[in-house]
């Protein structure tokens, strides 16, 4: 086990707190755009990791109750037709709370994913608060000197294959792989 001394700016979680007995909710969201206040989630994936292995997972398309811009459909492959009969966020909110309760919210650029999940809960009148951990910041500290810390570059660097980029479950599984290398 590697031990590093630093605090992540996005949270109060330090590398010393990374251990093989904590629960981590590794999450990715796909959205209708880049600003959580104005845009909505179209897909969410959560993979629970106990510090040693994956223990549970959840993934679903979500009906954002608005049109998905063409540029987003081109990027993610998620279309209005695909989400037309998908659940709305409020229909899966309880499951998201239950899966992430007591877990550290882990994402690649955590401020993006966390802000969208938090904003969706705020629209429902609920505060969503979790400790957060950013795999971008972690990777910069643990693997210094890489030309880029984007998920696609880390996948290339570590030889991680993924079926489809910009789909929540595939990106989350790639994040799990990066996360395990950091642990």
What are these regions (language model features)?
Residues 4-131, 144-166:
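Conserved non-catalytic scaffold segment of RNase H-like nuclease domains
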Residues 167-179:
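Acidic, divalent-metal-coordinating active-site segment for phosphoryl/phosphodiester hydrolysis
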Residues 92, 140, 174-175:
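Short Asp/Glu-rich motifs
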Residues 31-33, 137, 174:
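Short, glycine/acidic-enriched loop or turn micro-motifs at the edges of active sites
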Residues 130-140:
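A short, structured active-site edge motif that brings together acidic residues
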Residues 182-183:
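Mixed-charge, glycine-rich, non-catalytic linkers/tails in nucleic-acid processing enzymes
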């Amino acid at each position: 086990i590697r031990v590093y001394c630093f605090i992540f700016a996005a949270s109060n979680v330090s590398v010393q707190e990374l251990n093989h007995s904590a629960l981590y909710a590794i999450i990715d969201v796909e959205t209708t755009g880049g600003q959580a206040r104005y845009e909505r989630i179209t897909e969410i994936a959560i993979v629970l990791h106990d510090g040693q292995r994956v223990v549970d997972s959840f993934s679903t398309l979500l009906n954002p109750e608005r049109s998905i811009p063409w540029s987003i459909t081109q990027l993610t492959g998620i279309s209005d037709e695909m989400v037309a009969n998908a659940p709305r966020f409020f229909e899966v909110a309880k499951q998201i709370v239950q899966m992430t309760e007591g877990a550290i919210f882990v994402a690649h650029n955590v401020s993006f994913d966390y802000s969208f999940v938090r904003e969706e809960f705020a629209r429902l009148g609920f505060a969503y608060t979790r400790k957060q951990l950013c795999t971008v910041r972690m990777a910069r500290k643990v693997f210094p000197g890489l030309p880029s810390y984007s998920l696609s570059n880390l996948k290339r660097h570590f030889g991680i294959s993924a079926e489809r980029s910009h789909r929540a479950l595939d990106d989350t599984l790639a994040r799990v792989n990066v996360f395990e290398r950091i642990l």
